[in-house]
Amino acid sequence: MRERVFVGGAPFLGICVGMQLLATTGVEHGDTPGLGWIPGEVRLIERTDRAIKVPHMGWNDVQIRPHAALVEAGEAYFLHSYHFVPDDGHHALAMTDHGGGLVAAVGRDNLIGVQFHPEKSQTYGLALLARFLDWKP
């Protein structure tokens, strides 16, 4: 897979845990190495407010950053207890608010990862998947 993505330039889309695997490391089952394709760490969502539920489950707004590729603003379905914190903030393509800002999408070169579930996000998610299939990074 690494050769197809980095040598061959094949577009890569990671969804939910697939996005988290792009990180350097995660903490879900102790310190766990990721692929390291986008430097960063996956951390447990901290409950700073008792009203905030973990896991983050349900519909939430996706706010894009000015440099976002493929991802558009809209509403998507999320289900996760951990979140990706990229080392370089430029790799964060979109954010969502769940008791504070959480990265909703990451990317660089021919890699895109989304924390939400496009397959459950109705029209918004189908549009993202269609853009990915047509993407020529």
Predicted feature residues:
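Amide-donor transfer/coupling interface in amidating biosynthetic enzymes
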Residues: V5-V7, G40-P137
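Cysteine-nucleophile active-site neighborhood
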Residues: M1-H56
